[in-house]
Design a protein with these regions (language model features):
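Histidine-dependent nucleotide/RNA phosphoesterase domain, centered on the 2H-phosphoesterase fold
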Residues: 2-197
Length: 197
């Protein structure tokens, strides 16, 4: 008798960026050529709301349903990106270069609604995060071993004030596949936010 194995998917929920914002952020990657870092591909730049890990098909369908419901009751809003810096904050040695955004009330309401809805479902494996969260984009991941070889006073300063804004009109259910050339992301479902009335 054949045994069928449910597919496992590496899933996260994200805010994807408009092309012009991706291009402007990718342009900053050439500003620090001396930095030992793996830069994020332009097409992969995004803001992660929640990383959900590996899910089977049934769990994925439930996550999709929840995400659509949450999106439909939260209105469009804007995000302002204001700084490029090492991240996470206070982490030594730094692990990444981040683009940080302002934490608006609309962003907080959306993320809290999503977290609450996922946590109260008995059909998906989800644990709320007990840490403060602000919107950020991983611009690149630092090669730690190479970073440690650089004398502290010679390590490049990454602390750039920027001013980029964009409107968020949807959130996306994303699948990440780990390939030899790096992660490949696929949008599984686009969940539109509620239009302003």
């Amino acid at each position: 008798m054949l045994k069928f194995k449910l597919m496992r998917h590496r899933i996260f929920i994200a805010i994807n960026l408009p092309e012009e914002i991706k291009k402007k952020l990718a342009d900053y990657q050439s500003k620090w050529p001396e930095l030992p870092i793996r830069w994020t591909k332009k097409e992969n730049l995004h803001i992660t709301l929640f990383f959900l890990g590996y899910l089977n098909d049934e769990e994925l369908l439930e996550i999709c349903k929840i995400t659509k419901e949450v999106a439909s009751r939260n209105e469009l809003f804007s995000i302002n990106l204001n700084k490029i810096h090492y991240g996470p904050p206070k982490k030594i040695p730094p692990r990444m270069v981040w683009v940080s955004g302002e934490k608006s009330s609309d962003f907080t309401v959306l993320r809290d609604d999503l977290e609450r809805s996922l946590a109260t479902s008995d059909q998906v494996p989800f644990s709320p995060e007990n840490r403060a969260f602000s919107p950020h984009i991983t611009l690149g991941r630092i090669k730690t071993w190479e970073w440690r070889q650089i004398e502290p006073e010679e390590r490049p300063e990454v602390n750039e004030e920027i001013n980029l804004s964009f409107e968020v009109n949807s959130i996306d259910l994303m699948e990440s596949q780990l390939k030899r050339g790096g992660s490949e992301y696929t949008i599984l479902e686009t969940c539109n936010l509620k239009p302003e009335t």
